[in-house]
Amino acid sequence: MADPNIVLVRIDNRLVHGQVGCQWVGIANPNLIVVADDEAASDPIQQSLMKMTADSMGVGIRFFTVQKTIDIIHNASPKQRIFIVVRTPAQARTLIENGVPI
């Protein structure tokens, strides 16, 4: 199985917001943002706000727990250009320690 096409990883305690939408999406040109954060994965209000930013940039967005991201990231289509956003360095470390190729 090929590694997922991860084009950028960002640690940001605000997750997805205007700067992510305007600056980082423009630089990395992803077609999917994956928010790997346990709290956001279960909070529809946070998801709604982040979805507005992603929609304004024409990018898909998905919300998963850190563990779910680890479990499914290798199933990503090679056509997906994935931008992973996590809230903390500890979350990024967990992804790395569990085989997410970032």
Language model features with spans:
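N-terminal intrinsically disordered, cationic/polar leader segments
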Residues: A2-L8, D12-L15, V20-L32, A36, ...
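Short acidic, glycine/proline-enriched helix-loop-strand junctions
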Residues: A41-D71
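Short, low-complexity, polar/charged sequence segments that are solvent-exposed and flexible
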Residues: I27-P30, M52-D55, Q80-F83, I102
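Ordered, amphipathic secondary-structure segments that act as subunit-interaction surfaces
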Residues: G60-I102
